[in-house]
Amino acid sequence: MKYNSPYEIGLGDVVITTDDTGYKTEHLVLINYIKGETDAKGYTPKRNRTILVDNYGNRTTVYDYSQMEVVA
């Protein structure tokens, strides 16, 4: 299932992203920034973005939430 809104993304969600070659990778949601919403430290992002972390600790930034699939 794909996300319909950035508000549906939860911290700790396990998601699958697909790269340009069709290879699917499983990630964990680390941070979800929503455009126009201020976080606890006073940061307000200008666009939506989600920061993911894989099993090896590598971080990936996704700007289009519809590219991520939720693992049930």
Model region roles, listed by residue range:
Residues 41-43:
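Short histidine-centered beta-strand/loop micro-motifs
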Residues 14, 34-39, 56, 67:
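Intrinsic disorder/low-complexity segments
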Residues 45-72:
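Intrinsically disordered, low-complexity, charged/polar segments
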Residues 1-14:
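Mixed-charge, Lys/Arg-rich low-complexity intrinsically disordered regions
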Residues 22-39:
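Short beta-strand-centered aromatic/proline hotspots
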